[in-house]
Amino acid sequence: MSTSPYGGRLPNGLGLSVEPRPGAGLVSVALTVAVGGDADPAGLHGTAHLVEHLMFPRAAASDGPDGGHVARVEGAGGVCNAETHRDHTVFHTTVPAGMLTEVLEWEARRLLTFAPTESVLRTETSVIAEEIRGAAAAGGVWEAALAALHPGSRDAFGTAAELAGATTADVDAFFRRHYRPDAMVLSVVGEVDPDRAAASVERFFAGLPTGPAPAPAPAPGSTPAPAPARTAAPATIRTAPLPSPVSGAVLGHPLPDPVLDRSGHLAHVVLAETLGRTRLPRLTRRDPRIVSARVTCGYHGQWLGGAAPDLLLAQFATVPGAGPRAAADGWREVLTELAERPADPAEHRRALNALLLACHRRADSLTARSVSLGRTALLFPTAPGPDALPGDLARVTPAEVSAAARALLSGPCSVTELTAPTTPTGIGENR
């Protein structure tokens, strides 16, 4: 068995990356497509999410006892799932290594036979409507900050009312336009022979039609909005309040573009880890108005999980009546501390070590590794591969983290108040 990694493209443009892990006993296959919610047609917000769902065809009578795609994978002792982001969609499957050929055939089959029926379409739009309601109930703070800082941007979940009007012709046109082999990367990681895997991919995927390229129109919100004219204070953008179990506020900041300014982006990642690990816990101990505080970097906490625009969010729970002012005061306080005085070597090293551990855990997971290879190839084609990330992080200096804190202090910030329900008086009283 060859143990050398393989990378290349099929004649139809499909990207392929194969990374052997001898002795793993498993293999993970990720299909990453360079389309997400930013490409949703006008009036059909959520089409990319809907197509993702429709890529998991349900069992039909003609399928026989093995059932639909999910049933086949689970029957082989594997698991599969998918995620729709703003700028890409990824499908990942992990199975015993001996099932790789079958999984590649199934993956190609659902691309070649994509033809959802009206009944399946209506079922999946109902499922997505429930997901949208669940996301709204979970808060929607990331989406609120994104819309404030990057006008025109929308989440990848969708809008239930718009999806209710989607037709099979709509989703078929979207699929034909965007699910082209030259806009996809297939990543295979695990106990696999790269030469045999490449031969199987050629066998099953060579017949994918190339199709017309999408019109070169910029997606809404794909680039940051022009910075407002700088005044004495940075721009603060208030969003509509959001309901929450506890009162508080969420403050959002745009992150540097990870392609155009990779070092600046990673400095913000280290800043977020430093704040969350040491500075915010100290703040909650000394400020009685703040109950808890946390900071996340990247799309729902997945740093380098997407290209620009992306966000850093600071979420605060406060005592009743403190309002968003307490959160804003505390946030500026901890940022100013780091902006004026860099972290000492021990604090900086603890933050770096935590991030490096997360990198190594991702690399250890076959699924995470296969997803990372595809995501890097599509979203960050000029950047070094995922193996360069630990070294790039380790080179971030305390001075660069301080510069990142200064950038947040001087740049735009969204503020979303979290409002907790009030308990009516008299409930539970004995009269």
Task: Locate predicted features.
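Acidic/histidine-enriched segments that form metal/cofactor-coordinating
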Residues: V33, A60-D63, G68-F174, D195, ...
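His/Glu-based metal-binding/catalytic segments typifying zinc-dependent metallopeptidases
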Residues: R21, A30-T32, A213-R282, L304
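Non-catalytic, conformational "gating/processing" segments within enzyme and secreted inhibitor domains
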Residues: T168-F204, P412-S414
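A structural supersecondary motif
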Residues: E74, V250-P254, A272-T318
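C-terminal regions of mature proteins
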Residues: T3, V185-S187, R349-R431
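Short acidic/His-enriched helical or mixed secondary-structure segments at domain edges of catalytic enzymes
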Residues: V127-W142, A232, R238-P241, V246, ...
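Proteolytic maturation boundary segments
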Residues: M1-V18, D193-A240, D392, P398-R431
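M16/MPP (pitrilysin/insulinase) zinc-metallopeptidase core fold and M16-derived inactive scaffolds
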Residues: G23, S28-T94, S153, T274-S292
